[in-house]
Amino acid sequence: MRTLLDLDPKGKRVLVRVDYNVPVQDGKVQDETRILESLPTLRHLLAGGASLVLLSHLGRPKGPDPKYSLAPVGEALRAHLPEARFAPFPPGSEEARREAEALRPGEVLLLENVRFEPGEEKNDPELSARYARLGEAFVLDAFGSAHRAHASVVGVARLLPAYAGFLMEKEVRALSRLLKDPERPYAVVLGGAKVSDKIGVIESLLPRIDRLLIGGAMAFTFLKALGGEVGRSLVEEDRLDLAKDLLGRAEALGVRVYLPEDVVAAERIEAGVETRVFPARAIPVPYMGLDIGPKTREAFARALEGARTVFWNGPMGVFEVPPFDEGTLAVGQAIAALEGAFTVVGGGDSVAAVNRLGLKERFGHVSTGGGASLEFLEKGTLPGLEVLEG
């Protein structure tokens, strides 16, 4: 993989694909983590004498939509990098090209949301060529988007000398440790809504791990597959056989699987709703399990004791609606308390929990990519990485 150390930026206009897909509310950025993570790469290039053109997406707009403008991101970036300014032009436009060509060394230009361009997600060759006119070299530092074969990730990388930024390098180094000779015992904690989102990563990691802890709504598909009564909890009915098969494979490989023993349940998902605790395999209708229960929190903390490598992706409950955030926070605390272990967390809600607890420094690596980290652990590479190796 070509890295920033292979690039002499002096006097060059460098096109950088960053991941500024951050939460924005009332025109203000709510969490600047991804902006801060991009700064080492940007400052390195500026110190080397480059001018920079930045590309990013925000949300999933269906074409130009002021709600998804990168203007608030430009404002937040400026607070950390005064050289930066936002230009409200789609990156494939003539205006964007003129703005880019007028840059002087030391200047930074953030262009409008790449997803305002109709060809972005189709990896349109013509759009990729228009992006390529914006710079003389390309740096991919958007790990959170590196699993998407889009024009601003893969298309343009084939048309310019392409390099991995520092964040990309850091992510690949940390996640590779989870695949190559991880220190044992190795525990994986998976949560979130769907088994189908995690099948690939479970299949890839099963031969490498010792313990698998499953929480979140995806646990109910496993519990029902084992004959449990799960009330109105979310279940992927078409994945029951697969869930059973995965449990059988885990047993054959000597992997200990931990499923919830009890759950916090309610009749509907809303803050302050009346909750009950039930055994995880005996949830009566009309209740649905919305978080792991107190016994499970203790059992999961015990299951993590002594682990030397831990990967965590996905919440243990409906994290965004208190009190169903408590299980996720408890798991975050249990992992952070491990001494001498290499711990990695990825995925929006899991990372949000770690940040809310103020425990980021206690983790070996906090990944900026949820889907990207899962795909990397499943396949050992990503579309965005493959073009940097070409």
From Swiss-Prot:
A single MF term (Gene Ontology): ATP binding
Enzyme superclass (EC): transferase
Record-annotated disulphide pairs: none
Pathway: Carbohydrate degradation; glycolysis; pyruvate from D-glyceraldehyde 3-phosphate: step 2/5
Transmembrane helix recorded as keyword: no
UniProt EC number: 2.7.2.3
Catalytic activity: (2R)-3-phosphoglycerate + ATP = (2R)-3-phospho-glyceroyl phosphate + ADP
Subcellular location(s) of the protein: Cytoplasm
UniProt xrefs under PROSITE patterns: PGLYCERATE_KINASE
Pfam families per UniProt: PGK
InterPro entries, sorted: Phosphoglycerate_kinase (IPR001576), Phosphoglycerate_kinase_CS (IPR015911), Phosphoglycerate_kinase_N (IPR015824), Phosphoglycerate_kinase_sf (IPR036043)
Binding site residues for substrate: 19-21, 34, 57-60, 115, 148
Keywords: ATP-binding, Cytoplasm, Glycolysis, Kinase, Nucleotide-binding, Transferase
Gene Ontology cellular-component annotations: cytosol
Predominant place of localization: cytoplasm
Record carries keyword Ribonucleoprotein: no
Protein family (similarity comment): Belongs to the phosphoglycerate kinase family.
Oligomeric form and interacting partners: Monomer.
Record's protein name: Phosphoglycerate kinase
Species assigned in the record: Thermus thermophilus (strain ATCC 27634 / DSM 579 / HB8)
Taxonomic lineage of the native organism: Bacteria, Thermotogati, Deinococcota, Deinococci, Thermales
